[in-house]
A protein has these predicted regions:
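Structured beta-strand-rich core segments of catalytic domains in phosphoester-bond hydrolases
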Residues: 97-180
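Second-shell loop/turn segments in exported
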Residues: 18-19, 67-76, 88-89, 93-100, ...
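Stable alpha-helical elements in mature extracytoplasmic
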Residues: 78-85, 94, 105-108, 130, ...
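Metal-dependent phosphoester-hydrolase catalytic domains
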Residues: 13-21, 207-220, 226-327
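Active-site beta-strand/loop signature of hydrolases that rely on acidic residues for catalysis
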Residues: 29-34, 66-78, 85-109, 174, ...
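N-terminal, active-site-proximal structural segment of metallo-dependent hydrolase catalytic domains
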Residues: 12-115, 126
């Protein structure tokens, strides 16, 4: 249990969608890291002044670090191929909401999510790698502001916080995250900067989870955890809640009672995004609490690989993870 107060930037927006909209049975959640998604105009503006290191959160810039891949230059055909996946999320998967990572705000997201979506609740960050949401049109929601405490050093990413069906019996709170990269396996207490930053972020997420449990409302945490949670959950968090040595048992510790989480990818074989995907384990995931799980005992997992015909296009190094939840 963490008692630390979390300060979220209050949203100036109220309800979006129709407060009287009737939810369908269940809820379908998805998450997608879109690999430096920005408009062509923004890319062209930033490319001549790219930086030799990763920009800070307050800098609208991207890196051109020697020896490392640069943000992709996308054509309209690339955006169209990505939009095909967004259409699959809307039509085939019936996704209600998609947590987005590495997207430079609503204008960039609209290049891909161009029909049937509201693009909102993006974090207040200058850096092009923003976290936000694509919400199915007509679904009522409220932006709760940034979980700014996740930016632990001025260069890591805040969380995006949204409530679906606010004020109704179907209310669900969601936190979208893109945690520090580089510490995919092993203990967090190593003298390695990515692990040190991730270890600082862990109690921020736990405090958010604990607050939701005390409120008694269903919730989920979804996004790019940059961590192989299947391995992580096998090991204890350690005695210090403010500095855990692993993530899952820190977050899912039943303290306070009810702080127990289920993972979308648990027991699921890794599905590659395309022919060049040589990963063996997921780092994108969806975690739901006991209330959401008990109300939706039928759960359908999907991973949307890209169309083989689009192999070689500038798409993303991630593809969507989907979890359909029904009673």
């Amino acid at each position: 249990m963490l008692l630390a107060a979390l300060h979220a930037t209050p949203s100036l927006a109220g309800w979006f969608g129709s407060p009287s909209a009737q939810p369908k049975d269940g809820l379908t959640l998805a998450t997608w890291n879109m690999d430096w998604l920005m408009t062509p105009r923004t890319h062209d503006e930033l490319a001549p002044r790219c930086m030799s290191k990763q920009p800070a959160s307050n800098e609208h810039a991207f890196p051109c670090t020697p020896g490392k891949p640069q943000p992709p230059t996308r054509t309209q055909a690339d955006f169209d191929a990505l939009a095909h996946t967004a259409n699959q999320l809307r039509d085939e998967q019936q996704a209600d909401v998609v947590g987005l990572q590495e997207v430079d705000g609503p204008d960039a997201a609209r290049m891909v999510f161009n029909k049937g979506w509201k693009l909102d609740c993006f974090v207040n960050r200058a850096h092009p790698q923003k976290v936000g949401f694509a919400i199915r049109e007509g679904l009522p929601y409220h932006c709760n502001g940034d979980l700014s405490a996740l930016d632990v050093d001025g260069s890591t990413r805040a969380g995006a916080d949204i409530t679906l069906y606010p004020g109704s019996r179907n209310e669900v709170r969601l936190l979208a995250v893109h945690l520090k990269s580089g510490c995919f396996d092993g203990r967090l207490d190593r003298h390695f900067s990515p692990c040190e930053r991730l270890r600082q972020q862990a109690p921020v997420v736990e405090a958010w989870i604990d607050q939701r449990v005390r409120e008694g409302k269903p919730f989920a945490v979804l996004g790019d955890f940059n961590r192989h949670l299947d391995k992580d959950e096998r090991y204890p968090a350690g005695p210090d809640e403010a500095a855990p040595i692993n993530l899952m048992q820190a977050w899912s510790d039943n303290n306070p009672p009810g702080a127990v989480l289920l993972r979308a990818t648990q027991g699921e074989a890794y599905v590659p995004c395309d022919a060049d995907d040589h990963h063996k384990a997921y780092i994108d995931d969806i975690l739901i609490d006991q209330k959401l799980a008990s109300a939706n005992k039928n759960r359908r997992f999907a991973r949307l690989s890209f169309n083989p015909q689009d192999h070689g296009r500038e798409l993303s190094d991630h593809c969507p993870v989907v979890w359909g939840l029904t009673p």
